[in-house]
Amino acid sequence: MSTFVYVPAPTQETPAEFAAEVVRDAIDAAREPAVVIAGALVSLVPDLVLAALRWPFHDPRTTPAEPAITTMACLILAKAWLTLTVSNMALAWLRRQPVGFLRNWVPVQTALRVGVVNIPLLAAIVLGSLVFVVPGLYLLAMWSQAPLAMIDGRARWFDAANYSASLTDGYKIPLVALWVIVMVATAALTSAIGAGLPFLGLGGAVTPITWAVRAAMSVWGAALGAAMYFNLDERAPWNRV
């Protein structure tokens, strides 16, 4: 007589459980000294350069000269490029691979491809948000992994959009929730610093504290983005044994 043993199916992971795992990994990555130092410097150096150049955009009565605008544009591009390297460092740490700024360096050719691909994707996200917020958030979640997919060598050009869509299938809600929480918390903290410190008579501390917050969010943003990609990649159907 045959004996049948009932084996329960594995419990389906909930969005909250996935988000919690991402946050735990992001916290771990954000504690890695190499990631902290690189992420903080990528944020602080442009701020210090602009302060040294007496950047005029803070005063609406001042029209900046063309060299100042060029400097700002170069700093923005350089910061975006180097942020990709910080994210790659965090991803390498999560994969228990050697971590180093030069070791995980993102070549300029890759950074340019990321920019070329993501500009139209961001334009579509903005248009979707203008029509209604939900389509914009949906597109943001769907294409959010395109940059790291290109850095990771899983895609080269616009195939990154399809690869990201496959990775995020079934995980869009927790991804959107995490990014919204981060953006709201950052905006609230920045506003509190800008309004609260002058009220307390500490107006001179607004700028350095704002820089410190930006540096911390630079590290956290890179770690969170890497943790999202790492967990999605681990759960991808084609990577399951």
Language model region names:
Residues 1-241:
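Hydrophobic alpha-helical membrane segments
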